[in-house]
A protein has these predicted regions:
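Short histidine-centered catalytic/ligand-binding loop motif
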Residues: 55-73, 124-132
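Catalytic strand-loop segment that frames the active site of acyl-thioester-processing enzymes
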Residues: 40-58
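Short beta-strand/loop segment at the start of cytosolic alpha/beta domains
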Residues: 28-45
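Single conserved hydrophobic/aromatic residue that forms the stacking wall/gate
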Residues: 1-13
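C-terminal helix-cap and adjacent tail motif
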Residues: 7, 15, 112-147
Length: 147
């Protein structure tokens, strides 16, 4: 991270990571958290699926100080707790894939008994379930209420 900042690229990366068109096509921002932002994934095969992205541009957990990492993981836990209260899944799966998007983020995919891929790995973007704006808003409010 220091290398990115020293080359004067921090603001460029921040703008690209936080506000790019791809992000807005895939997700809806729910709220800023202490060191991250939480988004509702638009594709809702896994009802309540969210993504938590670190607020600054970093590629991996090891780039964070212990304090930053602990704060980020506290944000992730805060979101999963809210998801659990709002949607009552059997389990929440965590995914930290950064092959194509080099920015620290966690996918949080609720899993339900008899639901898609229960007992297996969740699909990144199955492209099966999209909701109305009102349904997205209802989910966002349920998560916010429990954050």
């Amino acid at each position: 991270r220091d290398d990115v900042e020293s080359r004067g690229l921090g603001d460029v990366y921040k703008r690209q990571c936080q506000n790019n068109e791809t992000l807005h096509n895939l997700m809806i921002e729910i709220a800023p958290l202490s060191v991250s932002r939480v988004f509702l994934f638009k594709e809702q095969t896994y009802r309540g699926r969210c993504l938590v992205a670190y607020k600054d541009h970093v590629n991996d957990l090891f780039e964070l100080s212990d304090e930053e990492r602990n704060a980020f993981m506290a944000d992730v836990a805060r979101v999963t707790r809210a998801m659990d209260k709002a949607f009552h899944p059997e389990k929440i799966n965590y995914g930290a894939y950064s092959d194509k998007l080099s920015h620290l983020h966690f996918h949080l995919a609720p899993k339900y008994v008899d639901g898609p891929d229960y007992g297996g790995v969740f699909q990144m973007n199955p492209g099966k379930v999209y909701l109305t704006d009102a349904e997205y808003q209802e989910m966002i409010e349920a998560i916010k209420k429990n954050l």
